[in-house]
Amino acid sequence: MAPGSDMHSLDALVQALRRLPGVGVKSAQRMAFHLLQHDRQGAEVLSRALHDAAQSVRHCARCHTFTEGEVCSTCLDPSRDASRLAVVETPADQAALERTGAFRGLYFVLMGKLSPLDGIGPKDIGFGKLLERAGDGVVQEVILATNFTAEGEATAHALSETLKARGMHVTRLARGVPVGSELEYVDLGTIAHALVDRR
């Protein structure tokens, strides 16, 4: 992988970079070579930032998103509409909804989606915790804002069936979001319209 057989640190860096989504061997090598050849100070800053984030960022006790405290600032915000709960797959999806400014409710972040082929079932993405949160007596509407991929649709369907069976009002983002897309890559106007036109 790296030139020479004594480059264990470089090989380890390339392998670590390959763990990032969408990064293959060549991209990882380019990044590693760039950091070591042109930006050693940037490499140190990146290393410290990764270490600090890994040590201090955890899951919110209420919504499961990332936070440095026990409970995230969104869950603690008294101006939020606690009667509306948007269910998203990832913190990136939550951030995409927040950037629209069209949603002032609260969130529940699944940290994944159902994927039976990969062995990911309801327990793996916090169905139980979501049911507890949605059934707290405060939540009046659960908005399913999972992605419009096959797994996201399956997750939304399973959640919808389970929540409706418990007498909860469930809506889904409108189809203004293109099928096969992921929220963090959709333009803000489309997301805002999808929220307003949800069914």
Curated annotation (Swiss-Prot):
Taxonomic superkingdom: Bacteria
Location of the Toprim domain: 83-178
Gene3D superfamilies from the UniProt entry: 3.40.1360.10, 6.10.250.240, RecR Domain 1
Swiss-Prot/TrEMBL GO biological process terms: DNA recombination; DNA repair
Keyword tags: DNA damage, DNA recombination, DNA repair, Metal-binding, Zinc, Zinc-finger
Cross-referenced InterPro entries: DNA_Rcmb_RecR, Rcmb_RecR, Rcmb_RecR_Znf, TOPRIM_dom, TOPRIM_RecR
GO MF annotations, alphabetized: DNA binding; zinc ion binding
CDD domains per the UniProt record, alphabetical: TOPRIM_recR (cd01025)
Zinc fingers (C4-type) by residue: 60-75
Role according to the record: May play a role in DNA repair. It seems to be involved in an RecBC-independent recombinational process of DNA repair. It may act with RecF and RecO.
Family according to the record: Belongs to the RecR family.
Family matches, as HAMAP family: RecR (MF_00017)
Name of the protein this chain belongs to: Recombination protein RecR
Gene name linked to the record: recR
